[in-house]
């Protein structure tokens, strides 16, 4: 999957997908939705191989990257990612947050090269909007 195949994310509330100040772009949290429809639900389960969540993580990350690129004007490109935050709704006892976040990092590296890798946080939470398994937020620079 490449972010070029994604349509702009559809906000699920009273917010914008991304905002820009100068050369910094902050995205809203993005879940694995296509055309506003959540494609993966439920918490990340301890007994499910991480590979089962790869598509959901990459879709959420692609939505965030698409939102960031939506703030560019003609002739601009994203120069890189400053930070990546990956929220993981998981069952109690889940410990592979960073390994799951690696799917997002790999997606960004493929899309932007070495500039796609910035600081990263992977956080476990009890629930996410719409019962999404992951939510991703980016800070990018132009």
Where are these regions (language model features)?
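N-terminal presequence-like segments and the immediate start of the first folded domain
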Residues: 1-84, 90-142
């Amino acid at each position: 999957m490449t972010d070029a195949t994604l349509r702009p994310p559809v906000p699920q509330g009273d917010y914008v997908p991304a905002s820009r100040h100068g050369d910094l772009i902050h995205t809203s949290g993005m879940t694995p939705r296509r055309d506003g429809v959540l494609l993966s639900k439920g918490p990340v389960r301890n007994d499910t191989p991480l590979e089962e969540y790869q598509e959901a993580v990459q879709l959420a990350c692609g939505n965030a990257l698409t939102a960031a690129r939506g703030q560019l004007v003609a002739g601009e490109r994203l120069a890189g990612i400053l930070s990546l935050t990956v929220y993981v709704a998981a069952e109690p006892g889940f410990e592979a947050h960073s390994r799951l976040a690696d799917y997002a990092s790999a997606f960004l590296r493929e899309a932007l090269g070495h500039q796609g890798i910035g600081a990263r946080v992977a956080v476990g939470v009890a629930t996410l909007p719409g019962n999404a398994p992951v939510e991703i937020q980016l800070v990018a620079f132009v």
